Amino acid sequence: MTTAVPAITSVSAAPAPGARLKMHREGPVLVLTLSNPTARNAINPSVYRAAAKAMRATSGFRTVRAIVLCGEGEHFSGGGDLRRLARQRKLPASEQHGHIGALHEWIMAIQEAPQPVIAAVEGAAMGGGFSLSLACDLIVAAEDAKFAMSYVNVGLSPDGGGTDSLVRALPPQAALEMLLDGTACTAGRLYELGVVNKVVPHGEACATALAWAQQLARGPFEVQARIKQLVYSARGRSRREQLEAERESFLASLYGDESGERIKEFLSPRKKQETSEEGPAT
């Protein structure tokens, strides 16, 4: 069932001519759609700010249990608006500094959201569009989708966390190949590398991502948030520090309401019967 987004519809505005962020609810799932189809859903600072605001607002709604990010029409996002950047060169660097900061606030809002965030990629995910998809927790891509760190092709270094995301996911050599070469990479190749989670037929990325989000939305909200936090903070910790973080998270989960309800359900006679009928797990 499609419903309006409660209490946060004000951030779904038309930020600038040709570039919009659309939002709607599908039950417990919030769907954010990049809408600028005539320009392959190019994004700009107004979209960055609207999206970051939406993400931060959504973090406070436990009724929103998962988030899907997609593009309108045939593409996910071609990245930043090069015409705007060409004009920006005539203005002080301090102004562009603020614009990039807005993009990076959006990236951090995705990472810090308690809900799982799934990118649904059709067509092109280029430059900032690729960085944006990588910032999401999970990626569903159409089999003919193309991804490229195309910044280098126009004499730019990446933003939007692209370097960080690739180095977290890949060996340095593979990351540098994408960053220095700038050519398109297929969804299948990224799936083989472990960057893309699911590859689906053309036109089915959003529907598949939404179905996955609906499944995740049935999971334990607070535990999923803790898992995200553990994963994203692991690289900056020693093994001992991560083990301590896991212990604290486990204890918080064990004594929380979510585990109490789910453990009780799992140990119920009915659940035992279902498990017995399914056979041993090993």
Label each PLM-derived region with a short phrase.
Residues 108-222, 256:
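Crotonase-fold acyl-CoA enzyme core
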Residues 32, 69, 81, 132-134, ...:
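Hydrophobic/aromatic residues within transmembrane alpha-helices
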Residues 1-72, 94, 108, 282:
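Conserved CoA-thioester-binding segment of acyl-CoA-metabolizing enzymes
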Residues 1-30, 182-188, 206-207, 211-282:
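C-terminal alpha-helix plus adjacent terminal tail
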Residues 46, 50, 102, 109, ...:
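Charged catalytic carboxylate motif
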Residues 47-51, 99-102, 132, 246:
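Hydrophobic alpha-helical membrane-association signature
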Residues 63, 71-109, 125, 153-155, ...:
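Glycine- (often His-adjacent) and acidic-residue-rich active-site loop
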